[in-house]
Amino acid sequence: MGLNHTLSLLKFLENPHKNLKIIHIAGTNGKGSTAATIYNILISSGYKVGLYTSPHLINFNERIRVNGVTITDEEIISFMKHVEPAVNEIKSTFFEVTTAMAFYHFKDHDVDIAIIETGLGGRLDSTNIVNPSLTVMTPISLDHMDILGDTIEKIAKEKAGIIKERVPLITAKQVNEVLKILEKRTKKKSSVMYICPNPESIQLNVDGTSFEVFGKIYTTSLIGCYQAQNAALAIAATKIINPKISSKSIDKGLRNVHWPGRLQLVSDNIYYDVAHNESGIKSVLKNLKIMFPNSNLYGLLCLKGDKEIDCIAECIKSQFEMLFVSTSKDGLLLSSKKL
């Protein structure tokens, strides 16, 4: 992590990020879903929108897209050939190169607005060289404690590092310790903080989630109570960007959003989720029990070796009728025996 390498690489590329209108998103859980929802609402409103997220689920190209079209292999190869001398000289990391690629791609495609998700933390994240029009903060909880800090306050300070001078912040509801840190940072930066209200009247089914917020009832194609919260935050963000965005555009964007790996129905009564920290897994289990209150749950679990295993084990204990564990041959995942 750090900013100097990214700045040097972007300078070589003639600073493609500087004239982009940007929404910058940080937080612990829900960043991708919130970013994808903002993206779809803005597209439905007639904007040409770039989206940069990480990590990818299936292939690298997913990280960078414009109006539903991912960056092509040819565009990736062309960019890498162009930037290779600078990368070798600067000794750029994978994420620094990927971030520069996103900005270059968005400038090349002349987007109206780019939605940029932080990779890890905020303060020293490679994306934190932008001067956005809006900062968005999803719920902050414990994750990546070996890098960001071992308390919620330390992690919140890292995330709050993306709040810029006089740039408004819209945040999801946060625990008091986090809220105090965000308030302090926005005050220091002469900014203003808006707190998104929690959605009400949430209803889940296999087709999505309906909820009420800002006096209207909406439905997102994503499943989960937390997806109602993510959608509410996305609606609030788009209304700050453009107060004239219509309810029709919001409705269309919410129904069109597709973000695989988030309580995704892959087959009859089989759901897949990429939750990888305690708060995320608790949310998944809570929503499954809401959807299937009288059913036994059977699970398949695999985790990378850098996760807080003890906390995760405690929160899934006794939640399943039967739990299977799996690993991978590449050594990235914990062994089945340890799990």
Question: What is the meaning of each model-derived region?
Answer:
Residues G122-L124, N131-K188:
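Conserved catalytic-core segment of NTP-binding enzymes
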Residues Y52, P168-K173, Y298-L301, E321-K329:
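Short internal beta-strands
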Residues Q174-M193, N205-G208, N269-I270, D310-L339:
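C-terminal helical cap/extension that packs against the catalytic core
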Residues H24-I25, S33-G50:
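A conserved segment at the C-terminal end of the G1
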Residues N19, D108-H109, I113-T118, D125-V136, ...:
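Nucleotide phosphate-binding/pyrophosphate-handling subdomain across enzymes
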Residues M1-L7:
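N-terminal pre-Walker A segment at the start of P-loop NTPase domains
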Residues S8-K11, N15-K18, S44-V130, D146-L148, ...:
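ATP-dependent carboxylate-amine ligase catalytic core
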